[in-house]
Amino acid sequence: HTDSSAASDVYKRQDPLYSPTRVLTENFLKDFNIKTTFYNPHDLKTLEKSITKKTKLIFVENPGSNSFDFQDLKKIVSIAKKNKILTTIDNTWGTPYFLKPIKLGFDMSIVSATKYYSGHSDVMGGSLAVNKKVFSKVKAAERITGLRLGPDDAYLITRGLRTLDVRLDRHSENAKKVAKFLSKFKNIKLLYPYKKGSYNFKMWKKYYSGASGLMGLKIKCKNINSVRKFVNSLKLFGYGYSWGGFESLALHQEYRETGTRKFLKLAKDEHLVRLHIGLEDPSDLIADIKQALKHLK
């Protein structure tokens, strides 16, 4: 979660954070005299303590990018309202189908339309939902900056939205079956709301009506080449970053920076692999993962 504000404003955000968002806040916003500070998503006291009179916005990513940490959303909204601070959430993972942030009290909710809204990996775009309090300011900014989708992109996203519920139900159903299979392996820590009793599961269950298809795997393996072979030997999974389409994807996040590994709580011999579970037959996906796991030594 992030808290950022300019010379007179600070912007609060969580850590870890989606890397392009991190670059935006750390490298781009500072040129506009906007300062960004971080808080621990599992310890919201760090958020409360870091708020100052200059804090203008709290930015939430739920779940956290690659960490898959879920937060207590109502508590964040409560902290923000108490201090008269605006709140924004990145709701790309859940989409409004599984989570409705504005109803929870958030001022703004952003979703990457490139992903589940489109559903076919053929569009680049985004959406912003806001409450009545900030609508006029956001609308004015939109007119000034010229944020308009092209007609073709708008058409393709509208097409995708017509099947959003059907697709997300299938993504969720498939991901749950894959998660159940992967949970049996002692050398794999599943980053997905599957393990009952965990803090992340409780926070997911408290606010979401379902789970989408993106998950992370913390794989304990001394040989990084074995992890690479595991990913490269998957036959039904494409290799790519932009998830949310109909197809399954795998990505080996080869983090080498000490800071990033610390943020993601990656041990020395742990490696992060991200899977997006698509709309294929779940038994085929599980069989594919099973044959690829033989490369982990």
Feature map (PLM): residue ranges:
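Single conserved hydrophobic/aromatic residue that forms the stacking wall/gate
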Residues: 1-7
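PLP-dependent aminotransferase-like
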Residues: 8-60, 78, 82
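Buried hydrophobic positions in well-ordered alpha/beta secondary-structure cores of metabolic enzymes
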Residues: 11, 58-61, 76, 90, ...
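PLP-dependent enzyme catalytic core of the Aspartate aminotransferase-like
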Residues: 19, 26, 35-37, 49, ...
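Active-site core of PLP-dependent enzymes with the aminotransferase class I/II
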Residues: 63-86, 94-100
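Active-site PLP attachment segment
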Residues: 102, 106-164
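Structural signature of PLP-dependent enzymes
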Residues: 159-181, 208-212
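Conserved C-terminal alpha-helix-loop-beta "cap" of PLP-dependent enzymes
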Residues: 190-273, 277
